[in-house]
Amino acid sequence: IFLNRTCFNGLYRVNKKGEFNVPFADNKSIKLTDESNLLKTSKLLKKTKLLSLSYDLVLKKYAKKNDLIFLDPPYLPVSKFSDFKRYTKEQFHLDDHKKLAILYEELDKKGCYLILTNSNTPEILKLYNKFNIKILNTKRNINSKGNLRTGKDIIVTNYETNI
């Protein structure tokens, strides 16, 4: 909570050594805690099983028919200067996206309802071309040039939507 509230735009990112490397925010009116919300969350978490495992292990072990699963992986960069994969020391590369696409198909065959978001790139479109893909105009909060704070993302589902 501290990192989310005190860092630039609530961003989480690491360097190649796996060290957190986001600058502090300039906002002096940061509210670190919301006691009421923390107490409600604490109460809910008492009934929750928390796991510290790779996403693929969790999904292979626990996903079952009719589960609704939302996947929001680090986005595949749309250019050499965009970098949305540095959330872990190992990063998340195209091969990781290919493995995720295979798992998406396995979960589909299992009867899960799936929603995945990602960048609108030819590679990602090809990986999920068997499924329903919607392209959405998006706004970015982080870009040094204000006129470049827009883009296109995709939502992939294995069921029909009205998006």
Locate predicted features.
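Short, well-ordered beta-strand micro-motif
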Residues: F2, I155-N158
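SAM-dependent nucleic-acid methyltransferase catalytic core
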Residues: F2-F70, P74-F84, K99, K110, ...
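Conserved acidic-Pro-Pro-aromatic motif
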Residues: K65-K145, R149-I155
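Flexible, glycine-/basic-rich loop-and-beta segments that form/coincide
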Residues: E160-I163
